C-alpha cells in the first residue's frame, strides 16, 4: 500500500447546504487525512481551466456554471491508496447508483449536483492539487 495524496472538491450544491463538516467526517472516517483545505469562489476562467478536459462535452457549460454558483471547498486528502479510497468513499457519479454510506448517496441531489469531485488517477491528482495549492500550503 502506498501513501498518496488526492484532490477533493466539495461542490457548490453541498457548500450552500453547509455540508462541509459532514462530508469531511465521512472522509476522515474512511482513513483519509485532510492535509490542506480552503474555501474559495471559483471564477469562470478558473472553472473552465480546471475542467478543460471536458470542453468538447455537451455538459461542459453547465458544469462550469454550477462550479461558480457558490463557493467550493478544495482540499488535499492523504492516506493509503488515497485516490482509489476517495473514489470509493465518494460513490458513483450518479447518486442513484452510489453505494449506501458514500458521500454521494448521503448528500448528492442529482447526477449534476453530486456534491464532490475527486481525482481519478495519481497523475491527475498531482496536477489538480497543484492547480489549487502551493506545496507550502500542504501539511506533511
Curated annotation (Swiss-Prot):
It is an enzyme of class 2 (transferase). The active site is at 117 (pros-phosphohistidine intermediate). Signal peptide: none annotated. GO terms for molecular function: ATP binding; metal ion binding; nucleoside diphosphate kinase activity. InterPro entries: NDK-like_dom, NDK-like_dom_sf, Nucleoside_diP_kinase, Nucleoside_diP_kinase_AS. Its cofactor is Mg(2+). Homotetramer. HAMAP family: NDP_kinase (MF_00451). This is Nucleoside diphosphate kinase. It comes from Gluconobacter oxydans (strain 621H) (Gluconobacter suboxydans).
